Amino acid sequence: MPASIELVRAGNWLFATGVRGAASPELFRRIEAALTEAGSSMSRVARLDQYYADFSCVPPYQAARKHAFQGRQVAPSTSVVVSRLRDSASQVDLQLIAATAASGYAPREVDTGLNRPDSSAYAPCLRVGELLFVAGQLARDDSGALAAHGVAAETRYIVERRLVPALQAAESALDLVLKAQVYVSGDAREFRGAWPGALPTTVIPVRHPAFLTREATVEVNVVAAHRSARGRMRNIDGKARLLDGLLFVGGLDTLEQAAEIFAAAGTDLSHVVRALFFHAAGEARAAQEFPSTALEVREGTTIDLWGYVPQ
């Protein structure tokens, strides 16, 4: 049976983690019901992350998702095929962030010039309050073709030709990125040599092919602050950033590291609002004390956390 949908409140935001099931309309009926009960709606969804068991799951899922958003642009999205889902009977493992109705936030698409596949129907960038959500970016040109090849070249293209212009159009900047998630199906060392190192970043080594543009080897999504929030953004030990109570943490190896970061931010691990455990076959699994999921990837163990510091 699919796991029940648990929505965790963090100030003006709701987090759903590890929403699993078939790639069907029923999945979104469950999500919509949970959002309504929690004081939100599909129209307030700010971001979606989808992990699939295989590529055959993508078309039915995207069709169901498009229908669920009822003609509106789908929230910024990242889709990755992983080696194995936590629930082997499921076709998709979904993560969602939404604003509460009480926040007054109305998601607004930002005209960044970024493209996306027509079948996916998602908005490449949304502004919700003073947060900017940029969908997963590949090294594609305006025609949708891959414009760079190899991990280092793709990374540089994504940063210089996709992220920097998009953030500028959204009245943000690279140094206002709160968190980046990076999926690499090649050599992660090449990525690190081409990536701006001062940003909280989670690097996940995935199988190849892993992306809907199958020859691509790097996909990057980011959450950034609008420039009006710069004065409220706080760096935490160079490994996390804090804005208005939301704690954005870069990828970690252990929960001991996480405890130190949360303590430095003025909170503790009881305020984890999302934990993603990426692990090689036979390695770490999800921690039951957190809203979490576990996803099998190519190698290693990477812990990706989001937290809350009560104001």
Regions found by a protein language model. Name each.
Residues 1-311:
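N-terminal presequence-like segments and the immediate start of the first folded domain
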